[in-house]
């Protein structure tokens, strides 16, 4: 069964690119035509590239890897957080802090500080302090939660990153490339395909399009988790030595995917068809 259908892509508005005066010539091969001054993306190619990206993500997770979901623009924030949380992956949907990948040791110290402050609050560590001190500590904790909450359990740099809007997230993409971390991303008509390892030509401005493609990547992660556990029939098994004990969230995911499974080997169902929205032209940023 197809990972996603042409109708789903059309309904989400994934075929709408930017205005013809705002494009990257390197994207020419992904453009089908232009309509009323708007480029139309070739969705047949999109389907092909989705399959390639899906397979890569599934195999990466099956062999113990993690995928960092990145999307800080308003249109992507909700779906990035929801889908990453659904499959237990780290995410950044507020502000990307410079060095989040290339200087992860420092970022990890800030994560430890966040957990320290949360523990203080929960165990009464704020008691006996002045109102001003409590206010300062609370503000610090809230700020850390807002910027780092999505990666609080990330112990090392990810195996790959999923990006919505490579232009807006150019710092994240640049850091990933410095560390040779594969980049999977939506490629709108104003993006540079040379910066992405696994491109998916599509609309990165429409909420429905970003949500649909993020859901596809999350579904690939979910299938990779099942393959890692050896439950997905016909999928390649993890290499010897890669089979770490499943995390609690992974066990819950497997239980949800196989509610009647006592040795069941059924693959996870394909992503549910989304409600068909009216086609819309994305805002030109």
Curated annotation (Swiss-Prot):
GO biological process: translation
Biased composition annotated in UniProt, kind: Low complexity: 257-285
Keyword tags: Ribonucleoprotein, Ribosomal protein
Parts forming coiled coils: none
Keyword DNA repair: no
A GO-annotated cellular component: cytosolic small ribosomal subunit
Protein name: Small ribosomal subunit protein uS2
Organism: Nocardia farcinica (strain IFM 10152)
Taxonomic path: Bacteria, Bacillati, Actinomycetota, Actinomycetes, Mycobacteriales
């Amino acid at each position: 069964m197809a990972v996603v259908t042409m109708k789903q892509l059309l309904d989400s508005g994934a075929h709408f690119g930017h205005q013809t005066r705002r494009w990257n010539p390197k994207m020419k091969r992904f453009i089908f035509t232009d309509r009323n001054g708007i480029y139309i993306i070739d969705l047949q190619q999109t389907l092909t590239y989705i399959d390639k990206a899906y397979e890569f993500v599934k195999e990466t997770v099956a062999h113990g890897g993690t995928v960092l979901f990145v999307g800080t623009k308003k249109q992507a924030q909700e779906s990035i957080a929801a889908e990453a949380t659904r499959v237990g992956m780290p995410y950044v949907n507020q502000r990307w802090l410079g060095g989040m990948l290339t200087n992860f040791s420092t970022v990890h110290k800030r994560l430890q500080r966040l957990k320290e402050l949360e523990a203080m609050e929960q165990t009464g560590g704020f008691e006996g302090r002045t109102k001003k001190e409590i206010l300062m500590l609370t503000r610090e904790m809230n700020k850390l939660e807002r910027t780092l909450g999505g990666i609080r359990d990330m112990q090392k740099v990810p195996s790959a990153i999923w990006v919505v809007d490579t232009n807006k997230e150019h710092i994240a993409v640049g850091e990933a490339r410095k560390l040779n971390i594969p980049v999977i991303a939506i490629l709108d008509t104003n993006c540079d395909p040379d910066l992405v390892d696994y491109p998916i030509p599509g609309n990165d401005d429409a909420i429905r399009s970003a949500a649909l493609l993020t859901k596809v990547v999350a579904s690939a992660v979910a299938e990779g988790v099942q393959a890692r556990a050896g439950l997905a029939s016909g999928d390649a098994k993890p290499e010897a030595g890669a089979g770490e004990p499943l995390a609690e969230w992974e066990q819950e995911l497997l239980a949800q995917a196989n509610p009647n499974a006592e040795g069941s080997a059924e693959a996870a169902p394909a992503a549910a068809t989304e409600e068909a929205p009216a086609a819309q032209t994305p805002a030109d940023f």
